[in-house]
């Protein structure tokens, strides 16, 4: 699909078996993350895949304050927090093109629901502490202005923006078809969104950094962006870097 030009950025996800004595509730309790989610009172929802899951996401999806809506696509991860790693993330051609593709996609998506859409911050780098040591992640911020009646149309607005571009790719529709062919797992709640709306403002996050439990045991779902410029070893190391739990005991 990439070589034919059906997609020029495809976010491919994999499932990694995990062995641990901790329950999903323990993982939720001790994980450090801006956004955390535990499904169900006992981490299970009856009738929905029969699974329990926990998410400790560093990536906002959209936030709304007043009428201002912002989205923060995260693209680019390096398993180190050294100056050398930062320079690589800032200058690598593949990482730069990947960011540009997703920022353009999300700018177009946001323009379907908001006016005055602009890129406020482009490719800012943030450290993330993990149980394996720090990693660096690259994000951008895109903002616009919602209509006065956005609260009564919140569901419609979110549906127009989904699925999140940072976990699918571009062009979105063709890439989603390619993902369905390529992946040998069911994503389920992984790469969806979750959040909180208090009647005035909205906070939401992309369901990444995600562990799931079923009758076979526990798995960690992770992934990354693939392009025609991808180098196999670098993509593998990025996927490994994302299999972590940001614990705080």
Question: What is each stretch, according to the model?
Answer:
Residues 1-249:
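Extended alpha-helical targeting/anchoring segments
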